[in-house]
Amino acid sequence: MSIRIIPQDELEKSEKRTADMIPPLLFPRLKNLYNRRAERLRELAENNPLGDYLRFAALIAHAQEVVLYDHPLEMDLTARIKEANAQGKPPLDIHVLPRDKHWQKLLHSLIAELKPEMSGPALAVIENLEKASEQELEQMASALFESNFASVSSDKAPFIWAALSLYWAQMASLIPGKARAEYGEQRQYCPVCGSMPVSSMVQIGTTQGLRYLHCNLCETEWHVVRVKCSNCEQSRDLHYWSLDNEQASIKAESCGDCGTYLKILYQEKDPKVEAVADDLASLVLDARMEQEGFARSSINPFLFPGEGE
């Protein structure tokens, strides 16, 4: 199954869904999203061997919250949604959509917000980014979108991505339409922007028991059934790994067919789990999966592969 976004003016003629149909997409709800992420990162930093880095990530998430409200985005995406729907493409496709200079404005605002909190190497990194030309910043953004991670140092990537993510999340929250599930493939990528997931979550509330993958760029969540590989869609050789026990709130779902894994967070086990924060705080599980010979099918926005990885 694939997911397509239907323009607002086409909803009535396609609206044959029943009231209890599974929502294929959950667009980002930006109110307090970054504050909640920052709080969770700080909470997880306690007694965690990666505590310092989690607190560093919390600073970036908090800065995103501040910049979000200082620089709201106004954009009419109606024409873009119609065009993308006709082409069967994600409306905010990272490989097609021209980038507005708004994202660089967000980056410089993030830097200004973070500078008083940074010191040492981290301060040097953002000062270097502050001096970079528009062309250099665009080249780094393009490299990240093309998964050419060797071209962007791993210490610069989180700052660049934080600005890009804020921009894409703002756009995603403005999409005037709804989603419809259709037959097709490639549900391993975000139906809104085409980026990768960071993790998946089995939710509570109105979507109780359903699994949604969380986009590492635009913050959209999309439904993928449980007990099925989110990367290759096979289900015959899946295994579940945890560091604690059967009731762990974080597990890794591995697939013997494609050799990858994706973490699953369970809100019913811990209602406070957060897609980005809990993924970053559980890198010990990633190390275990690497030892078992599996590769991540996701990328955390605060931890990009370095050269040679």
UniProtKB/Swiss-Prot annotation:
Any one GO molecular-function label of the UniProt entry? ferric iron binding
Q: Which Pfam families match?
A: FdhE_C, FdhE_central, FdhE_N
Q: Which InterPro entries match?
A: FdhE-like_sf, FdhE_C, FdhE_central, FdhE_N, Formate_DH_accessory
Report the main location listed first in the record: cytoplasm
The listed locations are: Cytoplasm
Q: By its UniProt entry, which CDD domains does this protein fall under?
A: FdhE
Q: Name one GO cellular component term.
A: cytosol
Key words, A-Z: Cytoplasm
This protein's source sits in the domain of life called: Bacteria
Q: Which GO biological process annotations does it have? A: protein maturation
Q: Check the record and name the HAMAP family matching this protein.
A: FdeH (MF_00611)
Q: What family does this belong to? A: Belongs to the FdhE family.
PANTHER family (UniProt xref): PROTEIN FDHE (PTHR37689:SF1)
Q: What does this protein do?
A: Necessary for formate dehydrogenase activity.
Q: Which NCBIfam families match?
A: FdhE (TIGR01562), PRK03564.1 (NF002925)
Q: What is this protein called?
A: Protein FdhE homolog
UniProt organism field: Citrobacter koseri (strain ATCC BAA-895 / CDC 4225-83 / SGSC4696)
